[in-house]
Amino acid sequence: MSQQRVFDSLTSLFSTHPVVFWHDVDAEFATVVDGLQLGGVQLVRLDDTPALRVKLDIERKPDQRWLIYSAKPEPEPTKDWLLDVRMRSKLFRADSSSILLEDLGLTTQGLRQHLKERGKFLRARDRVDRLKRLVLPGDTAADLDRKMLAVLTRADQPELFAMLQRLYAAMVVDGVANLSVEPKAWQDIAANELTPAFWELSQVQLGYADANPTLRDLLLRILVTDFCRGLQGDAPQQLAHFVLPDRTLAAIASVFVGRWRADIAQYGNYNALARAVAKELDLVNLLSGQSAENLVECMTFEDVELRVVQDLKKRIVAGAGANMDVVRSLMARRRDGHWANPLLASANERTRALVACYDALTAAADFFMLKATHTAGFSFANADTAFSQYRDELFRFDQLYRHFHTAADAVEPTGWAVLHELRDTIEGVYSGWFIPQLSIAWAKVMEGPQGLLTHWKLPEVTPQQAFYERKVLPLLDGGVKRVFVLISDAFRFEVAQELVQHTNSKSRFKASLDAMMGVLPSYTALGMAALLPHKTMAYKESTNLDVLVDGHLVATLEQRNEHLKAFGGIGVKAEDLMALGKDKGRELVRDHRLIYIYHDRIDMIGDKQVSETKTFEAAAQSVQELSSVLGFIINSLNGSAVLVTADHGFMYQESALDGSDKSTLDDKPGGTLKAKKRYLLGRDLGTSSKAWSGNTAVTADTTLDGSLDFWVPKGASRFHFAGGARFVHGSAMPQEIVVPVITVRETEAEEAKTKYVNISLLGAVNKVVTNTQRFEFIQTDAVTERMLARSVVVSLRDFSDGDKPISDEPSITFDSTSQLLDERKRSIFLTVLGGAHDPHKRYDLVMRDAVSKVEVLRLPIKVDLAFGNDF
C-alpha cells in the first residue's frame, strides 16, 4: 500500500473513531509512520511506551485523536492492558493481505494468510480485478482458489467443468487434438502455484486422484467413465481401471460430458478430443463384440456410432424384413444422440455422413419390410387393380430405393465401406427381384385382347391427354380466377408423393395427389403436348416427328405460348418466373387465367450419359425447387390453385446394365422413323413377340391420319445402351406411365394448419430420489402430414435459482406415425448433478423444443437424493 493510500485510509477512519490501532507486524511502514502528518492526531509507538501510560493519556485527553502504532501482533485479550480502549476503537491494517481482503470484499480475517500464499497470482492487477467480479463476502480458501483457477483459464463460470472446457479446447488446433500439449492456461496455473488446488478440486468434484495426475489422464478417465455408464453390461477389462471410482461423482462426470457435447460452441473441440481418446484406447477393437443394444445409450465416442451402424446393417441384411421394429427403435435413439443427430447435420462432413447412414438404414429396413409383405411376388386381377396398387403402395419400392441410394451416396466421400454390402443387397433385390417380378405381373395386364395396349383406358383414371379438360377446366369453371399448371419433366409419381408430404407440412398449403394414365410412348414431346388444352393431337409429317396440337407446333416454349393465347394463357420457364420477383411476376400473370410453368431438372440430368448417375440427386433437388415455386405462386403471385404434373416418369437403376437388360430384338423393323432406348416410332411396324406394340391413336388419342405405330421393350429392358442406359423412359412400366397430378390450394381452414405433436409425462413421477432417474413420455398424437414430429431437450431445473439446470440435458424425438399408444412411448434417463438439493425447494422437469427452445412441458418435482441414498 502506498503512503498516500495509508494517509487516506487513516484519515477516513479518524472521521468516525478517535482511537485507531495499527499493528504493522512486518514493520513495513515503521520508517514512514512519523511522516504521515495526520492533522490533530497524536502518534503513540506502543512498543516504546508503557501501556498503562498510554491508557492514562487517552483518559486525560478525551478530545484528542490517537494513532497507536505497534510492530507486534495484537496481544491476547487477557494480556491486553488496553482492551477497554481497543473495544471502542478501530483497527487499521496496512499489510497487502489485509488490503486485498478489503479490496475483494471478504469478511473472513482468517484468509489473510491464504492470500499471502497466493501472492504470485495477486501480484497482477488485471487478475485481481477479474477475481473481484467473482468473489462473494463469505468465500472460503477453496472458493478463492477455484475462482483464481477460473480467472487463469478464462472460464465463463468459476466451475471445474467450465475450466476443463477451456483447458481442453486449447489442446485442439484446426480441428485436430493433441493430448500431449500443455495449454498456456495450464502453465499459468503452475506458475501461480495453483496446480495442487486444481487437483484437489478434481478429487472433490470428480473423485479423480492419481500419484501423477495429468490433464490427459483426467480426460481419459472422464470420457471412459461416461462411456461405461452408458454401456449395458460390464465394461471391457482394458477400460475398467479408467472408470472414476465414486458412482455419484461418476454420474456428475457424465453430466459434464453431456453438456460439453451439447454446447454448440464446444462441439468441434469435443469431437476432436473424443476421437483422439478413442484412437489412444484402440476403441474400435474393444467394440467389435458389442451389440447395438449394449451401445444404444453410449454417446461418448464416434466409434460407437460406427459400430452401431455396422451391427444394424448386418441385421437388416440378414433379417430380410423381419424384426425391423427393434432396428427402427435403436436407430431412433441414436438419432437423438450426439454423433448422428440431424439437428447437428450441418456441423461437419462426418456428422452429415452418420446422419446419412441412418437415413440409408431406415430406407433399407422399410424396403425389406415392404418386400416381406410381397414374398410371393405380384399378381393383379386386372389393369385397374395393377394401376391402383402401384399408385397406392408399390411406388414405395422405387421411393425407398431412391432414398437409400441418395443417403448411401452421401456417405461415400468419407471412404467408409460400412454400407457397401447393404448397397449390393438392395440392388440385388430391386433389380433382381422387384423389377422382374413387377414386369412379369405388369405384362399380364398389358397383353391380350383385354390388355391395356388394346384399350389404354381405365374407368377411374384420367388419361393424360384429358388433363386440361378434367383437371384444369373444372377449376376455371368453378370460379377460380387463375390456374397455375407446373409441369416438371420426368417428375415420376413417387417423387411427387414426397413433394405432397413436404407441401402439407406447411401451414396454409393443402396438397392432394392423384395419378393419370400417361400417354404411350412415354416421352417428352408427346407428354408435353397431351397436357396442353386441345381438341386434337397428331404427328406432323416430318423427320422430327413433331406433335401438332390443334394443328399447331408446340415443341418450344414460344410455340406453346402462342397456342395458350387462345385459352387466355401463357407459358414460362420456372427459373424465369422466379427471377422476376413479386412485382414483375404479378405483372406477367395479371392478364392471364392460365399459366403453364415448365421445370426441368430430373430429365435434364438423367437423360445425359455424363450425368445420369446424379438422377436421384436431381429428384431431391426437384422437390426443393418445386416447393419454392409453389411458395412463390401462392405467397407472391396470389395463386389459389396450382396443379403439378409431369410429361412422363422414368426408370433408373444404380448398377451398370449388362446384356440381360437389353431387349433380344435383333434389329429395328422396317418403317421405323425414330429409335430410342425405350421406344420405336414408325409406320406399319407390325408386331413382335419381343416387344409391346401399339398405335398412338389408342394410347394418346392422336387422330387416325396423324397417328404412328410404336414398339416399346417389355419390362425394364432397353433396345440399346447408346448414350447412357440407367435412366430411361418411353415404355409402359408404371414408373413411366403413372403420371402424378398434385392439386395445391391455399386455405385458412383449421385442418390445413400444421402443428407439432403433443407430449405428456406418463405416471406420477413427482420425486427424484436417485442420481439417475427414468422418465417415460407419450406422444399423444400420431405424426401425419399436418401433425409434425418434434425433437425436444429434457432437463431438471432449479426454479428459484434462475432455472439453472441441475441435470444433464438429453434430446429425444417424438416422430411415431403409429395409431397405437404403446408404440408412441419414449423414455429417457436424467442424471442429477451432485450437491445439496433442498427437498423443500421447487425444482421442475422441463422440456424445450430442440430448435426453437420454446418450452413444451414444465412439471414441478422434488429432488431428495438423501432419501434415496438411505436405501
Residue ranges and their predicted role:
Residues M1-V483, R492-V642, A646-F871:
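…; additionally, a secondary subgroup of soluble metalloenzymes is captured
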Residues L486:
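Short alpha-helical catalytic segment bearing the HExxH-like zincin motif
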Residues D489:
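Ligand-binding pocket scaffold of soluble enzyme catalytic domains
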